[in-house]
Amino acid sequence: MTVIKKGKNKKKNLKNDDRYKELDSLITNGSEIGDNSGRSCIKRFFKIIGNEMKNNVYVYFLSILYLCVCVMNKVFAKRTLNKMGNYSFVTSETHNIICIVVFQLLYFIYRKTSTSGYKNESQKNFGWQFFLISLLDASTVIISMIGLTRTTGNIQSFIMQLIIPVNMYFCFMFLGYRYHLFNYLGAFIILITIAVVETFLSFETQSENSIIFNLIMISALIPLSFSNMTREVVFKKHKINILRLNAMVVLFQFFTSLLVLPVYNIPFLKEIYMPFSEMSTNINNGLRCLFYGQNTVVENCGVGMVKMCDNCEGAWKTFITFSFFNICDNLLACYIIDKFSTMTYTIVSCIQGPAITIAYYFKFLAGDAVRKPRILDFLTLFGYLFGTIIYRIGNIILEKKKMVKSQNSNDSEAELTCIETSTA
């Protein structure tokens, strides 16, 4: 039986090893290439990319799908903000209620159609994990709201992409991740692309920008990173269902979002500043704006003013569309973290920056927020994609080493078992 098991392991390892042959050829024979070294190296490089995409069609399809959903989520979030930006608390809590209903309904259907999986999960209590994720998400929102008040658009984009090194560091420290040189190189290329582009765009940056508030916004990446890592631990260690996680987290989030209320009473927050005495009036006006399309703030508002002008006509359509894509975004993000890792999710999501910018070129997507195309945006997207490819090559090499190590371990155990059997 041991010999048969050993044969199966060899067959499996040989099958898995096929995808790495081209990579081995590129690395091993790199020094043996003659006059056509450059052309041969490029040819091999693109052949590796082709084989990688062919062997991981599902991964790349899922990544593209998530990227499209994520872009639509951000675009319609911006369009919702343009219509009813004075009522962020109303939109936040209404969206939470919609998410509670949808996720609870989906999880109810899952329980009815998959009884065995539900029974296995129902024996475990994940209350503190749900509360921790909700609290981390609420903390991210609160800190980001404070930082955003004096952090201009271009700097916002740069700061959000810093999640790559932040996630790499915390995954290294707490989840035991180990990286290849190509992982660092890919992340470095992405960061350099961001730095160059944002430096170039800094000439367009508004004067109202504070380094203190920039640092506050950067600190929001810490709870965001820990939230993603907690999700990964819950998925990988406890094998919890994605629908159950989202159903419970959004339920906790409805209450943890109330922690945001004191933030609205901080005077230096300018646009979102709102005393507690005006809270009930704001909620009432927000509900009228969302469900009845009634404008309340129409005077002393607009560009350069403290408040935005209401544009509530058709607000509910834009808001429902945003909620739909946001729910899909959450499900796909959790699925990617569950099936792959936090870093895979981070690298895929970082491409959304230039993709969102390009989406604003199309009026049917961006509406009133449409912008003119710029070559710089396409160059940024190319830099992101190139860095992502280099990062993925690092993962391939690490997978190869892990597979070889596992193969050697299986062979050693099989040989030891055979020796013990023959001795007996």
UniProtKB/Swiss-Prot annotation:
Gene Ontology terms for molecular function: xenobiotic transmembrane transporter activity
Q: Which InterPro entries match?
A: CRT-like, Transprt_Chloroquine
Intervals, Cytoplasmic compartment? 1-56, 110-125, 178-180, 231-248, 339-346, 399-424
State its location(s). Vacuole membrane
Give the GO cellular component terms, alphabetically: vacuolar membrane
Where do glycans attach?
N86
In this entry, the parts of the chain located on the Vacuolar side of the membrane are 78-88, 147-156, 202-209, 270-317, 368-377
Which keywords fit this entry according to its UniProt record?
Amino-acid transport, Disulfide bond, Glycoprotein, Membrane, Transmembrane, Transmembrane helix, Transport, Vacuole
For this protein, the record's Pfam families field holds: CRT-like
Biological process annotations from GO? amino acid transport
- Which cysteines pair up through disulfides? They are C289-C312, C301-C309
Bilayer topology annotation = Multi-pass membrane protein
| Transmembrane helix listed as a keyword | yes
Entry's transmembrane regions: 57-77, 89-109, 126-146, 157-177, 181-201, 210-230, 249-269, 318-338, 347-367, 378-398
Looking up PANTHER family in the UniProt record yields: PROTEIN CLT2, CHLOROPLASTIC (PTHR31326:SF1)
Entry function: Nutrient transporter. Involved in maintaining the osmotic homeostasis of the digestive vacuole.
In the record, the note on similarity to other proteins reads: Belongs to the CRT-like transporter family.
This chain belongs to the protein called Putative chloroquine resistance transporter
Organism in which the protein naturally occurs: Plasmodium yoelii yoelii
